[in-house]
């Protein structure tokens, strides 16, 4: 039979200590107290601006077979280099080296998504113009 939690008139300290220890099993609590949010490339922000340093193709994981179009971005705020996915068919053509891009997170909190290994971010804007607007032909790149 399980022991369970202590009961009794003088069990308060033991209960408080146990609760304090058990909080560390919660991932959100862990991240909050250890300050992991500030150690990621965005430093707690939802978006970040950066410069495109090169275009890269990243091979997708098994069982898929494709080359996912990505760019290497040098973030302006902290000079970290990241890989960012370029969504939609043909949008890589709107990007050139040294273009300023706005990058956002991609999918699950701090994890790569789908079959693209090691890519945690996506390109949202190029030179202040939405990538979606460029793709649909509503705006032109300056």
UniProtKB/Swiss-Prot annotation:
UniProt family annotation: Belongs to the universal ribosomal protein uS12 family.
Any Pfam family: Ribosom_S12_S23
Listed name of the protein: Small ribosomal subunit protein uS12
Organism this protein belongs to: Tetrahymena thermophila
GO terms classed as biological process: translation
Leader sequence segment: none
Matches recorded under Gene3D superfamilies: Nucleic acid-binding proteins (2.40.50.140)
PANTHER family linked: 30S RIBOSOMAL PROTEIN S12 FAMILY MEMBER
Domain of life: Eukaryota
Source organism phylogeny: Eukaryota, Sar, Alveolata, Ciliophora, Intramacronucleata
InterPro entries: NA-bd_OB-fold (IPR012340), Ribosomal_uS12 (IPR006032), Ribosomal_uS12_euk/arc (IPR005680)
Keywords assigned by UniProt, alphabetized: Ribonucleoprotein, Ribosomal protein
MF-aspect GO terms: structural constituent of ribosome
Annotated Gene Ontology cellular component terms: small ribosomal subunit
């Amino acid at each position: 039979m399980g022991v369970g939690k202590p009961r009794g008139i003088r069990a308060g300290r033991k209960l408080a200590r146990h609760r304090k220890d058990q909080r560390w099993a919660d991932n959100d609590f862990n991240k909050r107290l250890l300050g992991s949010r500030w150690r990621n490339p965005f430093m707690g922000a939802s978006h970040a601006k950066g410069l495109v340093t090169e275009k890269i193709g990243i091979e997708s994981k098994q069982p898929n077979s494709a080359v996912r179009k990505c760019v290497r971005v040098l973030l302006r705020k902290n000079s970290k280099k990241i890989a960012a996915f370029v969504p939609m068919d043909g949008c890589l053509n709107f990007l050139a080296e040294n273009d300023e891009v706005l990058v956002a997170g991609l999918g699950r909190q701090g994890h790569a998504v789908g079959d693209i290994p090691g890519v945690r971010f996506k390109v949202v804007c190029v030179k202040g113009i939405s990538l979606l607007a460029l793709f649909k032909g509503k705006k032109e790149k300056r």
